[in-house]
Design a protein with these regions (language model features):
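Membrane-embedded helix-loop-helix hairpins and adjacent transmembrane boundary segments
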Residues: 1-495
């Protein structure tokens, strides 16, 4: 496809998003922006959350995992399913009972202001870093595919991307996101489905035949129990997947804000249960595509792409979609799917960051009624500017530095996990002023634990490869730290 054609495609896509914004954002109130007036259809929220769960990185990378891991990623997905059940049974009833706008308001009720601010601050850091990282990767891809050849600087690409997101989230907020997420989920699934159909046609296979082919079986092993030191060992993936979901969905304002738009806890639970089933199915589809991509590449002698001399399996999907003669239809759906995957996570991040900062730090609900909407709009602009600056900073750093920053940001979910676990599982109160210190110490200790195999290979950890299980370890260290600074008396709050 020519760059001008891709730009036209992007323009049409955003016109549709802005039209949805116009139709859903007419009310332009804080209640609609933050909670969608608690009137969102639960089934729509469930379907749209699939798109929000699959970032642009996931859209490209999950199919690429098949080469080194086969279907091992599904072990983690099964953990996700269990994690969603825990969120459904424990956290959703709690949030609805407290009637919170920001889920971190629970921490103030349970422990005090320092714990509240600590939890909200760690969410802001992790979500700003995570959203910026994902936007950076997709903006980089779009710069390479389209804008570089037109002489458009990278910073312009970034500013335009975030400006477009600001335009369609400015009025409706989460009420708009519910509908745009649905559209973006459809776009992603269409892209993957078209790719599977076209590859099967080229291979002259039916879908039923695919699962009986030896070449497919050799790329689709799911369970790995052989090597406990391996990063794809079953219990690492499965247990890690449970805690990833609890922390990065149940304790994340971005993800939970959508669940809190449902009319009541019962409907929100139905939404979460349906979404957990759909997510398993969607990940099976993505991994199936991954296996077919590598089979197709082997059969037609397509080299796996390299970037800076490094083989990049996660670039095989865009390479085949854009350059390997499967037709303009696949190229079009791939571009739309990539844009949808990127912006479905970025737009909800912008909305949730605006919500968290407005509620948790500006205390918007305590402001005069006339000042509330202007304050929210100022915060929305401010968050947009922060995202632009961080993405541009990422572009000036070396790739390894950016990756390590993103990895370190994921450690901030450990203190959230520990804080909420301590609040829900115990009746103890803490010396609230020490919470921030406990959280920072937990992050640093966890980080040093992950470095142990590299710097101290003869230690008791040896050659152990840490994976997702580092999150519950981080949470456990936080839990122990809170226990050490807890008071003897019990809280009167029913938690």
């Amino acid at each position: 496809m020519q760059p001008t054609q891709i730009i036209l495609l992007i323009a049409v896509y955003f016109v549709v998003l802005i039209l949805i914004s116009y139709l859903t954002g007419k009310e332009d109130s804080n209640e609609a922006f933050f909670k969608a007036n608690k009137s969102a259809p639960w089934y729509l929220v469930a379907f749209g959350m699939i798109g929000a769960s699959l970032s642009g990185v996931t859209f490209i990378s999950v199919p690429g995992l098949v080469e080194g891991q086969q279907f091992a990623y599904l072990q983690g997905v099964l953990g996700f399913f269990v994690g969603y059940l825990i969120v459904l049974l424990v956290l959703i009833p709690l949030y609805y009972q407290l009637n919170v706008t920001s889920i971190y308001q629970y921490l103030e009720d349970r422990f005090g202001k320092t714990s509240y601010k600590t939890g909200a601050f760690f969410f802001l850091i992790s979500r700003v870093t995570g959203a910026s990282f994902r936007l950076y990767l997709v903006a980089l891809a779009m710069q390479y595919i389209v804008f570089e050849s037109l002489g458009i600087p990278f910073w312009v690409t970034v500013v335009l991307s975030i400006l477009l997101i600001w335009l369609y989230t400015n009025k409706g907020g989460i009420k708009t996101i519910i509908w745009t997420d649905t559209l973006q989920t459809i776009a992603m699934l269409t892209s993957v489905s078209v790719a599977i159909i076209l590859i099967l046609n080229k291979l002259d296979w039916t879908l039923a035949e695919t699962f009986t082919k030896e070449t497919f079986k050799n790329k689709s092993k799911i369970f790995f129990f052989e090597d406990v030191n391996s990063s794809i060992y079953f219990w690492k993936y499965f247990i890690g997947g449970i805690f990833i979901t609890i922390a990065m969905t149940g304790l994340d304002q971005d993800m939970m804000q959508k669940n809190l738009t449902c009319k009541n806890a019962k409907e929100s639970k139905k939404n979460m249960f349906l979404m957990s089933i759909l997510l398993v199915v969607v990940n099976v589809i993505f991994l199936t595509l991954g296996a077919l991509l590598f089979i197709y590449a082997e059969q037609f002698n397509i080299a796996i792409p390299e970037l800076n001399g490094v083989t990049r399996t996660d670039l095989l999907f865009p390479e085949i979609a854009m350059n390997q003669g499967l037709g303009k239809g696949l190229a079009i759906t791939f571009i739309i799917g990539l844009i949808a995957a990127a912006y479905s996570s970025a737009d909800s991040a912008l909305t949730s960051l605006t919500t968290s900062f407005s509620v948790d730090f500006c205390h918007i609900e305590n402001q005069p009624i006339a000042a509330q909407k202007p304050l929210r709009k100022k915060v929305h602009v401010g968050v947009s500017i922060v995202l632009i600056v961080v993405v541009i900073i990422f572009n000036s750093l070396e790739g390894s530095v950016v990756s390590n920053l993103f990895k370190f940001a994921t450690f901030t979910y450990g203190p959230l996990l520990g804080l909420f676990a301590f609040g829900i599982l115990t009746k103890k109160t803490t010396h609230d002023k020490y919470t921030w210190m406990v959280a920072i110490i937990a992050i640093l200790l966890t980080y040093f634990i992950t470095l142990t195999p590299s710097y101290f290979p003869d230690s008791f950890i040896g050659n152990y490869n840490f994976h997702w299980e580092i999150l519950p370890i981080n949470g456990f260290i936080t839990f122990l730290g809170l226990l050490m600074v807890s008071k003897k008396q019990t809280t009167s709050i029913d938690s």
